[in-house]
Design a protein with these regions (language model features):
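Glycine-enriched, solvent-exposed interface loops adjoining structured elements
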Residues: 1-208
Length: 208
């Protein structure tokens, strides 16, 4: 049986566990596994781009729903203005008080992004960031992971189920399976990102 949807995953998990009395628990095991792989995977399929306008005098803005990690951020100006990460302490130290201008730095605190200096006008900032995969449910029956890496879902869900079943001897088996599935997926995605070409670093003059 192919594992390519929420329902086929639940059926496969029940079959592999040889249990027919876990229909209420299996969705919980799936959700726990989703929390795990969203923390560790950083794939191209997780990348999103969003454009937001700043407001003059407003220093902080909400991060997008599902935000996991920043990949790149810049102001959509001509030429493009790079915005560099700073720790919160450094951001406050440099731009304390009422200083304002075109943002050149940012920091993340909680679920907000803070700019320094405080924007003095409306600037469009463009974020490329990693977003959590959408969770599977009865109304959202597929996502990228279940279609492209069903082993991550299967092994991870089985791993979450075994402690509930007090079947500790099976935990290392599913743990190894999940670890290998995640490692293989991340390694292949890293290779595909560069299409087999050598990674080069641009110097300060803009040349390789």
């Amino acid at each position: 049986m192919a594992i390519n949807s929420y329902s086929t995953l639940q059926t496969a998990v029940a079959n592999w566990l040889d249990r027919d009395d876990l229909s209420d628990r299996i969705p919980e095991f799936i959700a726990l596994n989703e929390a795990v792989f969203n923390r560790v995977l950083r794939l191209r399929a997780m990348e999103n781009i969003t454009t937001t306008a700043t407001v003059s005098g407003t220093k902080s803005y909400n991060l997008p729903t599902g935000y996991v990690q920043m990949r790149e951020i810049h102001l959509d100006t001509s030429p493009i203005t790079s915005v560099q990460y700073m720790t919160p302490e450094m951001l406050y130290r440099i731009w304390a008080g009422s200083s304002s201008g075109k943002p050149s730095a940012y920091s993340i605190i909680g679920d907000k992004i803070y700019f320094g200096p405080t924007p003095d006008s409306a600037y469009n900032y463009v974020m490329t960031y990693y977003k959590k995969f959408d969770s599977l449910s009865d109304s959202a029956t597929t996502n990228w992971i279940i279609l492209n890496a069903p082993d991550v879902y299967l092994y991870g869900t089985l791993l979450q189920a075994e402690p509930f079943l007090m079947n500790d001897q099976r935990i290392p088996i599913w743990e190894r399976g999940l670890r290998q599935a995640i490692a293989d997926l991340q390694e292949q995605d890293d290779k595909d990102r560069h299409s087999g070409s050598e990674l080069r670093v641009m110097n300060t003059s803009g040349y390789y």
